[in-house]
Structures are given as C-alpha cells and as structure tokens.
Amino acid sequence: MLGKAGNNMQYIGFDIQDTHYGIASDNIIEILQDGVITPLPCAPQGVCGMTHYQGRSYPVLDLYDILEVPVDTSLSCMIMVETKQHYYFVNVHTIPYLFED
C-alpha cells in the first residue's frame, strides 16, 4: 500500500490480545495518554464516552468493548482519528507503536 507521496504507508499499531491492529498515520491527528473520558448514559456498545480536546468535545470509541474482550483499564491511550469530515478518539488501552506496510 502506498502513501500520499508514493512511499510505504505508515501505521500506528496496537495489540488487542494476540491480534495486531493499525490505523494509517495519515488519519491520525493526536495520541493522548490518560485522557479524561466522560461516560455517556445509554451510549451504544463501543462508545465509552466523550473527551474534550482543544476546546471541543469528541466521541471516544473503545475497541475492547466493540470486540468484546476483557481489558486492563489501568492504562488509557487515545488515538484521535480523522475520517473525511469526522473526528473521534479510539481508546486502545495500550502503548501504540509505528510500523510500515
């Protein structure tokens, strides 16, 4: 897969149990450690709440909840993702790493 400049695409990776996942670095705005998440009552599965970033509120998705796997909640790492005109955070509960395709 090629990036915008024709180079190999870079990804921010993280592991959930024994599976590796990645988000294209072109879509990543920010990575936050230990951000504050405000729970939302009656939120659908996978939406763990909202967080504030630079004066705006954004939804936070929890991949562990979406995939229905247990999580050690002592660590929180949120990746801000941009997709077209939408922004949201993904809480991955692990330290992300960089890799290339």
Where are these regions (language model features)?
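An acidic, low-aromatic, low-complexity terminal/linker signal
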Residues: 1-101
